[in-house]
Amino acid sequence: MNDLRPGEALFERARAIRDAATGTRITYSPKVFIPLTKLCQDRCGYCTFAEPPARVESPYMSIAEVLKVARQGARAGCHEALFTLGERPELRYPAARTWLVEHGYESTVHYVHAAAQAVLAETGLLPHGNAGALYPDELALLRRVTPSQGMMLETLRDDLDCHAGSPDKTPERRLATLEAAGQLAIPFTTGILVGIGETRDDRIAALHAIAESHARHGHIQDCLLYTSPSPRD
C-alpha cells in the first residue's frame, strides 16, 4: 500500500475491516423527516436548525400536522418517521412551556412520546426519536413507541466556544445518554461533528468512546461523521 495516495491506505484498511465484519451488502431504510419543534434551549454556534419563537408559527407541530407529514412519507414509500427537535426548549422559552401545559404534556419528551405513538398507530411507520441528551427514564418512555433512538455525541471537548451556551452539550451528559441507551438495549444512532474547533486527536477520542460503549452494550446501529456548516450570521 506504500504507493497509494495519502488516505487511500486508511480507506483500504477500513474497507477490509468492514468486509470482514458485515460484508459488502448495503441496507437502507427510507424515512420522512418530522421537525417536531425548532425551539431549543441550547445555543450552538454552528446550528442552522434551531429558531427563536418569533420565527415559528407555533412552538410545536400539532399531532394533526405530524400525521399529515407521516402519511405523505408513507405514500412515498418511507418506512421510518425521523423525529428531530431542539433539546428541552421549555427550559428556555416561556412559549414552549405554555404550549405544553395548554396541551396537557409534562415535557417535550412526553410530547415526543405522544406524537410517535400516534404515527405508529395511524401510519405504521417506525418512529425514530432524536430528542437529544435524555435521562434513563426518558429513554425508557420513548422506547415504548420508538424502535430506535439517537443523539450525536459530537465531541468530548468541554471547552469549545460553540457549546458555551449549550447545557446539554457537555461530554458527561452525552456519554451518560449513550450509556443509558445501551443499558436499556435501545438501538442507537450517534456520531461526531467535524470542524467545530476540535483536533484530530479529539475526533479519535470521541470515536473510541463510542466504540467502547458499543463493545459493552452492542447497541450502536449507526456512527455518523457530520461536518459543521458555516456559523450563522
Residue ranges and their predicted role:
Residues E51-E212:
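Conserved Radical SAM active-site core
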Residues Y226-D233:
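Conserved small/polar residues in nucleotide/adenosyl-binding loops
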